């Protein structure tokens, strides 16, 4: 009986787990300064999502929110979509700590949505749906 060869390439996945609690402020700053404003990277997306997901108290929430606002200013529509998604994580997961400031977030969401296309637009729409459901907004 002939033995079949594995026709699929073999590879190993590197498991990367990053949380804000494991990120030092210096690490967050390093990622934010090393990735150019008009580019994306896996590490930058990890920082953005962790900022939205891992705040454990009001001080961390305020820090995360300010960093997300800073990242939103980048000249990259994908980064803006990631930031909007992180805002939705704050809205859904961290509303017991603090609520999103609608007067700040809503104009950013509307602007990002109007300029977005493809998967960025879909991500922003999902974030809008999550924010609307969590905070009873009508974006």
What are the roles of these predicted feature ranges?
Residues 75-113:
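Amphipathic protein-protein interaction modules
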Residues 41-44, 80, 121:
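Residue-level detector of extended alpha-helical repeat arrays and alpha-solenoid scaffolds
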Residues 28-39, 66-73, 77, 107-114:
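HEAT/HEAT-like alpha-solenoid repeats
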Residues 21, 110-139:
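Eukaryotic acidic, Ser/Thr-rich intrinsically disordered low-complexity regions
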Residues 16-22, 53-62, 92-102, 134-139:
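Flexible loop/turn segments at the boundaries of HEAT repeats in alpha-solenoid HEAT proteins
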Residues 49-53, 88-89, 129-132:
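Structural signature of alpha-helical solenoid repeat scaffolds
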Residues 44-49, 83-84, 125:
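Hydrophobic core positions within HEAT/HEAT-like alpha-solenoid repeats
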Residues 2-46, 139:
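N-terminal "cap/leader" segments of large eukaryotic alpha-helical scaffolds
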